[in-house]
């Protein structure tokens, strides 16, 4: 619909150039066509006249009047009016929305998909949890947001690669290995001799027992077997990392999250990528030595202070491999790189970007892009749930899925802006009522399936072509409200992709479900008159399709029965 209105406005501007109202060399402005905040102001509004007023040497409202008069007639536009300082508001005819139903039916699964990305490459990194324990609910939020964002970008025509970065090097892995070794040697977290910074969850005992039993872990086709030797710390390290990576993969699969690339931090050292990044920075002239350490002049690139890259003992600070890792993304040809992180990583953003800018390789400012999420509080029975017996100190993603469902967890972890703190109410997520938004939306889809089954049971033969031809009979308030919501879907998908905000899909689906449920309660679908019945079934099927399309972008199922 936006495309139709933009075309009409463009023709009107050409007419004003032709009659001299606008200078002949006036370029069409980058005007906006958007939905007003309230329906009273029409279905769409444009600021075109306000942008052209200066060129026309006219006040915006007068030019808006001239542009309105120059607009070509269209059966899809019922009324056009001027508002405020020069906005032009369009009220669409019912035929415009009825035609959109036909577009939904024709395009099916492709309805709402766009070409904004034009096949360009984007790498989306998310979760990237240390392989030191079970995934917690914060990782779950990262997984839900990141996976849905990747789906939304794919729907906008981007060539998306999903990436998981494993921090499998450093002190945390050392602490993991020492913790498993202590368990393998018969110690418990309460014993004298337990590692000072060791991990204390019950899962450590699971890893130790599997190692001592000589179990084999199949990690993405790579077999790692426990050697049963509690003194072999290196074997324990390899086995523990493989075991816990495999556990994380199990949880992510249950959560309908997968990846194209698993990138290991250890490979950056093995393949010389860390040293390559350091040498590029030294060659750029943006480093200096002081106190036996190597420093990056990151203040030259917006950081609040210069950063140590290599300490006096020769080891690298943690942001250096981060810079090296993102350098590989650039070298792999990602036009865009998007990293989803917890808000507690905010401090690393500027220094990573500074490191990339300092290399002077033509990497754009603001590359990579970041999506930051806030923490999650889990509630049950009005009280906060803080611990998991298995993890020892936090609520795991597996716990949450087992208590509710993957659908509910994904929905609730996506459905708010990432930068807002989120409360996950287990009781609400389990409720089969309209108060539960995921139930409410899924029930709308299942309700359409139920109506189609009822039609078949009653012996009604649904003729979709007939229904499309008879949509004009659906001109009541509630039918048009559903059609209006259906027409919004492509815009919502596009905006969610531009803003990197998949939560907008969830908000939209709730509004569509509300419009559908309201229509259903106020309109008998299976009437005797075939024309009206087929038209209503066609509207229901179009709603079913858009609900399914949107739920797929969230990674939430569209059930046929509930």
Swiss-Prot record:
Monomer. HAMAP family: Arg_tRNA_synth. It comes from the Bacteria. SUPFAM superfamilies: Anticodon-binding domain of a subclass of class I aminoacyl-tRNA synthetases, Arginyl-tRNA synthetase (ArgRS), N-terminal 'additional' domain, Nucleotidylyl transferase. The lineage of its organism: Bacteria, Pseudomonadati, Pseudomonadota, Gammaproteobacteria, Lysobacterales. Keywords: Aminoacyl-tRNA synthetase, ATP-binding, Cytoplasm, Ligase, Nucleotide-binding, Protein biosynthesis. GO terms for molecular function: arginine-tRNA ligase activity; ATP binding. A motif ('HIGH' region) lies at residues 129-139. Its EC number is 6.1.1.19. Pfam families: Arg_tRNA_synt_N, DALR_1, tRNA-synt_1d. The keyword DNA-binding does not apply. Belongs to the class-I aminoacyl-tRNA synthetase family. Its main location: cytoplasm. It catalyses: tRNA(Arg) + L-arginine + ATP = L-arginyl-tRNA(Arg) + AMP + diphosphate. It is an enzyme of class 6 (ligase). GO terms for biological process: arginyl-tRNA aminoacylation. GO terms for cellular component: cytoplasm. It is found in: Cytoplasm. Gene3D superfamilies: Arginyl tRNA synthetase N-terminal domain, HUPs, Isoleucyl-tRNA Synthetase, Domain 1. This is Arginine--tRNA ligase. InterPro entries: aa-tRNA-synth_I_CS, Arg-tRNA-ligase, Arg-tRNA-synth_N, Arg-tRNA-synth_N_sf, ArgRS_core, DALR_anticod-bd, Rossmann-like_a/b/a_fold, tRNAsynth_Ia_anticodon-bd.
């Amino acid at each position: 619909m936006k495309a139709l209105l933009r075309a009409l406005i463009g023709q009107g501007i050409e007419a004003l150039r032709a009659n001299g109202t606008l200078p002949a060399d006036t370029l069409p402005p980058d005007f906006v066509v958007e939905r007003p905040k309230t329906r009273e102001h029409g279905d769409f509004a444009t600021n075109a006249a306000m942008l052209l007023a200066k060129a026309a040497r006219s006040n915006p409202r007068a030019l808006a009047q001239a542009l309105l008069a120059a607009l070509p007639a269209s059966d899809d536009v019922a009324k056009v009016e001027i508002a405020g300082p020069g906005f032009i508001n369009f009220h669409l005819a019912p035929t415009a929305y009825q035609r959109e139903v036909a577009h939904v039916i024709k395009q099916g699964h492709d309805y709402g998909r766009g070409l904004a990305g034009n096949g360009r490459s984007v790498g989306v990194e998310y979760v990237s949890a240390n392989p030191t324990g079970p995934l917690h609910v914060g990782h779950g939020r990262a997984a839900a947001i990141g996976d849905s964002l990747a789906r939304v970008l794919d729907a906008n025509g981007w060539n998306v690669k999903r990436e998981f970065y494993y921090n499998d090097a450093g002190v945390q892995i050392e602490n993991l290995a020492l913790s498993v070794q202590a368990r393998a040697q018969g110690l418990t977290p309460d014993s004298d001799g337990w590692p000072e910074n060791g991990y204390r969850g019950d899962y450590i005992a699971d890893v130790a027992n599997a190692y001592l039993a000589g179990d084999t872990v199949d990690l993405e086709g790579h077999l790692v077997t426990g050697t049963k030797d509690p003194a072999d710390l290196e074997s324990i390290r390899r086995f523990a990392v493989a075991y816990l990576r495999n556990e994380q993969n199990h949880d992510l699969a249950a959560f309908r999250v997968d990846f194209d690339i698993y990138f290991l931090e250890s490979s950056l050292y093995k393949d010389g990528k860390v040293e390559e990044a350091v040498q590029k920075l030294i060659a750029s002239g943006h480093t200096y030595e002081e106190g036996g350490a190597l420093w990056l002049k990151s203040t030259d690139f917006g950081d609040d202070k210069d950063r140590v890259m290599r300490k006096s003992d020769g080891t690298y600070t943690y942001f250096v491999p981060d810079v090296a890792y993102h350098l590989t993304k650039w070298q792999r040809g990602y036009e865009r790189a998007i990293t989803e992180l917890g808000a507690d990583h905010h401090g690393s953003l500027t220094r990573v970007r500074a490191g990339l800018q300092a290399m002077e390789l033509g990497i754009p400012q603001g590359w990579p892009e970041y999506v930051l999420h806030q923490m999650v509080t889990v509630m049950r029975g009005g009280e906060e749930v803080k611990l998991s017996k298995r993890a020892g100190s936090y609520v795991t993603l597996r716990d949450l899925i087992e208590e509710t469902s993957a659908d509910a967890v994904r929905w609730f972890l996506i459905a708010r802006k990432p930068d807002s703190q989120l409360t996950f109410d287990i009781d609400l997520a389990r409720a089969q009522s309209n108060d539960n938004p995921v139930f409410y939306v899924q029930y709308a889809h299942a309700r359409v399936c139920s109506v189609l089954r009822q039609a078949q049971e009653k012996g009604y033969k649904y003729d979709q072509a007939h229904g499309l031809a008879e949509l004009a009979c659906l001109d009541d308030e509630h039918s048009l409200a559903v059609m209006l919501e259906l027409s919004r879907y492509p815009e919502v998908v596009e905006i969610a992709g531009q803003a990197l905000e998949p939560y907008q899909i969830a908000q939209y689906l709730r509004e569509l479900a509300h419009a559908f449920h309201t229509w259903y309660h106020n309109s008998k679908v299976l009437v005797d008159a075939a024309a009206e019945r087929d038209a209503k079934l066609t509207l229901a099927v179009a709603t079913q399709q858009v609900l399914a399309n949107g739920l797929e972008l969230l990674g939430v199922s569209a059930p046929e029965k509930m």
